Amino acid sequence: MTEEGFWKFLEGRGRADMVLYSTETGDPDIDAAGEFIRGHALLPEDYNNLTERELEEMGELLFREKVKQKTKEAVLILLAHQVSDTALTILTKFNMRPDKPLVYFARLALEESLMWNGNP
């Protein structure tokens, strides 16, 4: 999956209903958490019906150097909401060496994935 293909895939699936609000604080960790929360607005209506192949293709984007940070954030959000060993494995692997600007964001995604997958 290409970065452009990912966004077309995402745009074609609609959006899950939600209300979000957060503000910038100046604290990098708190602001990253706010960005993570706002990122949930990207979840498609059928976010829990992604195939293992789709998860793998999206996950590959995390490990490509030239993929934009916003794309990686969207992938992290989608993977975080999957009840899937594949998604959990990808997030665990990415958290071993995340892109520097995504360290906290990636950790939040992994923690959310652990929750969805029944691991405290």
Model-found features: residue ranges?
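Positively charged, hydrophobic/aromatic-enriched amphipathic segments
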Residues: 9-14, 112-120
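Structural detector for internal amphipathic alpha-helices that build alpha-solenoid repeat scaffolds
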Residues: 31-49, 71-83, 93, 104-116
